[in-house]
């Protein structure tokens, strides 16, 4: 396995400021529900996340701001985005005013695997 690929999982954290080499400068996570796994992710202005995938199918609901996924498009409040488990994408970034996104893991725990699958 490529050593640049790492897996990160958060299950029991109510609120967490998440910092990592793949996240600049950080994002804030707030657990809404454990089952199904629903997190509110707050991106500061222009925050970026590197290429990654999730271990489960994931639905994004854009609540505020602008959420940009390289190779896809810019998402705005009310937009939905669906990603199948194991599909790598990104980088992704918030717009100039930041973004708030609900991330719903539809068939498993919330997690991130950095790099290409």
Name each region found by the language model.
Residues 71-88:
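Short acidic-glycine-tyrosine-enriched beta hairpin
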Residues 55-70:
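Glycine- and acidic-residue-biased ligand/ion/polar-headgroup-sensing regions
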Residues 1-35, 116-117:
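A short, N-terminal "cap"/entry segment at the start of jelly-roll beta-barrel domains
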